Regions:
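A juxtamembrane structural motif centered on a specific transmembrane helix
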Residues: 1-10, 48-49, 177-183, 187, ...
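N-terminal signal-anchor transmembrane segment
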Residues: 1-49, 63-78, 93, 127-135, ...
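Transmembrane alpha-helices of multi-pass inner-membrane enzymes
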Residues: 17, 164-168, 215, 219, ...
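Aromatic-anchored transmembrane helix interface
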Residues: 36, 57-72, 79-105, 116
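Hydrophobic transmembrane alpha-helices and their immediate junctions
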Residues: 49, 55, 115, 332-370, ...
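Alpha-helical transmembrane segments of multi-pass inner-membrane proteins
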Residues: 111-138, 152-228
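Flexible juxtamembrane loops connecting transmembrane helices in multi-pass membrane enzymes
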Residues: 234-245, 257-290, 314, 406
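Long extracytoplasmic/lumenal interhelical loops at the membrane interface
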Residues: 274-336
Length: 407
């Protein structure tokens, strides 16, 4: 029996499985070979289908990738060969994250690509959940536990992506649907609600509270949008329209970086510092402010192009990284790379807004979840870029005719 492989679905699936996550049981050198092979295959796919990518979008992505590459190469002597290699590879991946997603969705449609993404990610999600329970729940923290695809943050962000894809695939409301509140219970919905409950419990069990916040944030917005819209239709539509504006999304990214400055300033107020110490709540807050105090000094030394992707410069002061998404991007790529990241965020959200549908809103909710989490974690990476690409392509899909979209 002949098995026909859809190259578009396969390209997205191998991108997810080999360029976004790593199986911890596989050795570093072996996985590196996998990554290089997949990068080359995806590059061939992109080159042969480059006509599907708008020129201005491609130029923006290449500019962002080059900012990472230049910073990495300039700092190669300080960072060493392995960090330099990682930075060069990430540069390559950035281009593929956007272009593979854009091409695949333009050729096969967002529903097919989302379904293919969901199916392949289940190959990682199921064993990850098994290893979470096998490891058990530590009394203090689960950050050092190693699961199927990494630590608790890797599993938590996978949960967020799975939730986003599930919401997208299960939002079948049409624009001319009645706005009355109808809740029909069937086996499919029971399965969906069960999945929601599982990922919420898993994040709580792992003590991945940032991931738990992201999931609850997305779920609340999705529930309000779908089931309560008939009561607050006008106000809610206005709110969604407001947060969907590309300028608002971009400003939100900037604001997520300002939290580092604000929190450090608040902790320097004697009364607040003494109160937090008296109730034993200085832990994570204090450790982050110790990092934030040194961020300005670190960035000022190389403000234009930064220290290169993967640089361990922050660890020389306090902590493994900047504990803030935008600050980490600025450390990696400087002002230039940060500006380009903001620019491509604006571009993708401007294109995505053209979809004007509740289905693609799942990607917008996820983007905001990553933005909010970036105030205390490093979330502006590959997953964030792919979500931007998916949301952007949904806007293009809505704009183009069916004949332009599908082969």
């Amino acid at each position: 029996m002949n098995i026909k492989v859809d190259i578009n679905l396969a390209a997205v699936q191998i991108m997810w499985l080999f360029l976004m996550m790593k199986i911890t049981l596989v050795g570093q050198s072996v996985w590196m070979i996998f990554e290089l092979t997949v990068c080359m295959l995806c590059t061939i796919y992109v080159i042969t289908n480059i006509k599907y990518v708008p020129r201005n979008a491609l130029m923006l992505v290449i500019a962002l990738a080059m900012s990472y590459l230049v910073s990495t190469l300039v700092n190669r002597e300080c960072n060493g060969p392995w960090i330099t290699y990682t930075g060069v590879e990430f540069t390559w991946k950035i281009i593929l994250y956007f272009t593979v997603s854009w091409i695949a969705i333009k050729k096969r449609g967002s529903n097919n690509i989302a379904k293919a993404s969901w199916n392949c990610l289940m190959l990682y999600w199921v064993p990850s959940i098994i290893t979470v329970f096998a490891q058990g729940r530590n009394v203090i923290d689960n950050a050092n536990n190693v699961y199927f695809i990494g630590n608790k943050f890797n599993v938590a962000y996978l949960n967020v992506v799975m939730l986003c894809l599930l919401l997208f695939l299960n939002n079948e409301r049409k624009e001319n649907c009645s706005r009355s509140f109808v809740l029909k219970i069937n086996s499919k919905k029971i399965g969906v609600f069960l999945f929601y409950a599982v990922i919420v419990f898993i994040d709580y069990y792992m003590k991945a509270y940032t991931g738990l916040f992201m999931i609850l944030f997305i779920l609340i917005l999705a529930i309000l949008s779908r089931y309560l819209q008939f009561r607050i239709a006008k106000k809610w539509s206005g709110f969604l329209n407001f947060i969907g504006k590309p300028l608002i999304v971009t400003i939100s990214v900037v604001a997520s970086g300002l939290v580092a400055i604000i929190l450090e300033a608040i902790m320097n107020i004697p009364t607040i510092g003494a109160y937090l110490a008296s109730i034993g709540k200085t832990g994570n807050i204090l450790s982050r402010t110790l990092i934030y105090k040194n961020l300005a000094e670190i960035i000022e030394r190389k403000p234009l192009i930064g220290y290169g992707y993967g640089s361990a410069i922050v660890s020389r002061y306090f902590g493994p990284n900047a504990q803030n998404g935008l600050a980490q991007v600025m450390i990696y790529t400087g002002i230039l790379g940060t500006f380009l990241m903001l620019l491509i965020t604006f571009y993708c959200c401007k294109a995505g807004r053209q979809s004007k549908g509740s289905q693609s809103a799942a990607f917008l909710y996820a983007i905001y979840a990553f933005i909010l989490s970036a105030t205390v974690e490093i979330t502006y990476g590959g997953t964030f870029f792919i979500l931007l690409a998916f949301y952007c392509a949904c806007g293009w899909e809505k704009k183009l005719s069916r004949g332009d979209m599908y082969e």
